[in-house]
């Protein structure tokens, strides 16, 4: 049984590097082929939210750890939480 996760992140103040990394970030998440993927930036572009399903906490954490935004140090903060929508 898969679990649902929410990945909430806030961008660092480096708009040029963020803009240059967006295509790799999007390709990363689409390339994972995760069930239930839904994601995108906040309207003010200060961060974003991604929801998805994973088999366990480790699979979800790996998806976040390999996100180019994380690897390039472009996030001020981020949270990964199991999510139970009602």
Region roles according to the model:
Residues 1-86:
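Conserved, structured core segments of small domains
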């Amino acid at each position: 049984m898969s679990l649902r996760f929410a990945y909430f992140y806030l961008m660092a103040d480096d708009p040029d590097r963020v803009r240059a990394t967006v295509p790799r970030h999007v390709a990363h998440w689409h390339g994972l082929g995760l069930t239930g993927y839904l994601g995108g930036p906040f309207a003010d572009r200060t961060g974003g939210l991604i929801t998805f399903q994973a088999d366990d906490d480790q699979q979800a954490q790996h998806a976040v750890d390999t996100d180019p935004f994380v690897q390039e140090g472009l996030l001020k903060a981020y949270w990964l939480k199991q999510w139970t929508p009602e």
